[in-house]
Amino acid sequence: MGPLWLDVEGCELTAEDREILAHPTVGGVILFARNYHDNQQLLALNTAIRQAAKRPILIGVDQEGGRVQRFRDGFSKIPAAQLYARSDNGTQLAEDGGWLMAAELIAHDIDLSFAPVLDKGFDCRAIGNRAFGDDVQTVLTYSSAYMRGMKSVGMATTGKHFPGHGAVIADSHLETPYDERDSIADDMTIFRAQIEAGILDAMMPAHVIYPHYDAQPASGSPYWLKQVLRQELGFQGIVFSDDLSMEGAAIMGGPAERAQQSLDAGCDMVLMCNKRESAVAVLDQLPISVVPQAQSLLKQQQFTYRELKATERWKQAYQALQRLIDAHS
């Protein structure tokens, strides 16, 4: 597997998609709502992606729940993370949410959902109800349960957005936010605890600048990724960049410069989404390399959607989560 994640055009592969997927620098494909029409089509698309790559490749999606759920019709509704803490049995429901989300993706030959959000607080426009809580203990309690659910069915976990995106109001999809606080120790407590618990397989840093600490966005900062994440916190898993086509990454230069800076800073894999010319520029200019440890993120189970929906576990989780959503809609 190479270090670059990119997207494909639609519900079926184009000739250009196939050519690009065969490039050795490509290590992953991230899917969007436009890639989904129905369950059978999605399964066929993922089979075609793996065949075109001619080698192991990761397939991922943002399917964390609430407003960030790319596949809707034909999939169970997953609650927004904020809802779990509002229920008496929220810990079990959070575990059900992680399990159900992961199981349904695995049944469609998808390896990863980039989840969960470990950011604290609801004020940031980009985060909002994607956060599990606005205090450290609430985030730890419910994110841990959600990740237990994911891992129990064979999906790796990705914590985001290190070292904490929740306190900035600006949206890093649209601009580069600055977190002007003197200390982000509270936010860091969450990431530290989940690393020490050994429950995180991958990490996604924020396109946020913390000027009190460093002048670069965390996603392109050796200080945050090498010194803090790797050395001080001892994180051993895969580090993804967030989408480098987002405006929050523009401060790092053009597409190839962004990718190279992120890799040099300590990212293992980089995402370049929804701008094909940018992805091609990275393929053309990035030296060919492999990320052997990324194979550990491939899904650990295999079953069909029909088999999954026939289980009592699926029926119980589906009904419990639907009741939670209905109670707060």
UniProtKB/Swiss-Prot annotation:
Substrate binds at residues 62, 70, 130, 160-161. Pathway: Cell wall biogenesis; peptidoglycan recycling. GO terms for molecular function: beta-N-acetylhexosaminidase activity. The active site is at residues 173, 242. Its EC number is 3.2.1.52. Inhibited by GlcNAc, 2-acetamido-1-N-(4-L-aspartyl)-2-deoxy-beta-D-glucopyranosylamine (GlcNAc-Asn) and O-(2-acetamido-2-deoxy-D-glucopyranosylidene)-amino-N-phenylcarbamate (PUGNAc). Its main location: cytoplasm. It catalyses: Hydrolysis of terminal non-reducing N-acetyl-D-hexosamine residues in N-acetyl-beta-D-hexosaminides. Keywords: Cell cycle, Cell division, Cell shape, Cell wall biogenesis/degradation, Cytoplasm, Glycosidase, Hydrolase, Peptidoglycan synthesis. Optimum pH is 7.0. Transmembrane segments: none annotated. One of its GO terms (cellular component) is cytoplasm. Optimum temperature is 45 degrees Celsius. InterPro entries: Beta_hexosaminidase_bac (IPR022956), Glyco_hydro_3_AS (IPR019800), Glyco_hydro_3_N (IPR001764), Glyco_hydro_3_N_sf (IPR036962), Glycoside_hydrolase_SF (IPR017853), NagZ_Beta-hexosaminidase (IPR050226). It holds the Pfam family Glyco_hydro_3. It is found in: Cytoplasm. GO terms for biological process: carbohydrate metabolic process; cell division; cell wall organization; peptidoglycan biosynthetic process; peptidoglycan turnover; regulation of cell shape. HAMAP family: NagZ. Monomer. Plays a role in peptidoglycan recycling by cleaving the terminal beta-1,4-linked N-acetylglucosamine (GlcNAc) from peptide-linked peptidoglycan fragments, giving rise to free GlcNAc, anhydro-N-acetylmuramic acid and anhydro-N-acetylmuramic acid-linked peptides. Hydrolyzes rapidly p-nitrophenyl-N-acetyl-beta-D-glucosaminide (PNP-beta-GlcNAc) and 4-methylumbelliferyl-beta-GlcNAc, and slightly active on p-nitrophenyl-beta-GalNAc. May play a role in signal transduction between host and organism. Belongs to the glycosyl hydrolase 3 family. NagZ subfamily. This is Beta-hexosaminidase. The lineage of its organism: Bacteria, Pseudomonadati, Pseudomonadota, Gammaproteobacteria, Vibrionales. The gene is nagZ.
